[in-house]
Amino acid sequence: MKKLLIANRGEIALRVVRTAQEMGIETVAVYAEQDRNAPYTQMADEAYLLPGDTNLQTYLNEDLIVDVARRAGADALHPGYGFLSEFPTFARKVIDAGITWVGPSPHVLEELGDKITACKVAERAKVPVVPGIAEPVSDMRVLLDFANHNGYPVMMKKADGGGGRGITPINNDDELRAFYMNHDALQGGDLGDYFIEKFVDKARHVETQSGRDSHGNFTVYSTRDCSVQRRNQKLVEEAPAPFLSDDVIAQLEGFSHRLFATAGYVGLGTCEFLVSKGKVYFMEVNPRLQVEHTVSEQVCGLDLVREQLDIADGG
């Protein structure tokens, strides 16, 4: 890896530029007009303008960014987080252009791209999931049967939700019927985007910062507790996650390993779990670097961007 394009902006672009330059890798930044004088464009070895007025025309423009990477002579591309970092179409275009994609493969991004398909990966890996129906249900009777068999409360969750979006708690039959009527696909609603899960009471939200290389070597860099939230948005991240028994830690690490191995995951990512009464339940995998990766760096003593670049380069 000799020349790296960072397909992002702001803090994460600056973060990747810094590490790449420490590794002796030339860096290429891309920017929309409003970011022309941003610190990351000044620090990078080269910077290219993305013409356009919106994110869709600039930072979300897959073909334009791949074309810039070609013109700049970049042999690798780091997507950062957000924007195109989880788009399998973009990853495939980068790879098809002969450029190293710093992240998991397009196939892995597809499998982990929404909560329903990710739960199916977990089931193949024999990792416990929260009791639920891991597919959209259009029959009201099926939803009511599930809720009454497992007990309220339950949750209706959007398959492509993230960051606390698309979660609706349901406490009784009337609320479930109201949700169904408001989202019924036959009336132009989005019921087909939702699945049902049992609500896990008094659960902690614990995640593992994990990595796996192309040789199958796996590690958990640290656990993180992100249970302190407001409106399902994380407020505080603590690493390592406190007050976990040895058995729970072993479950978290073992389940993360099985998830990565089953998916054929190569790169860094975050496995998210619910922990309740000594039991661990899979939630999702974030197949990219997360904003909070620096919390894990503080306790593991490693540069996780360097780890990403080493793994992508075959290390």
Regions found by a protein language model. Give the residues of each.
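N-terminal beta-alpha lobe that positions the nucleotide/phosphoryl donor
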Residues: 1-271, 275-296
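Catalytic cores of soluble metabolic enzymes centered on carboxylation/carboxyl-transfer
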Residues: 296, 302-315
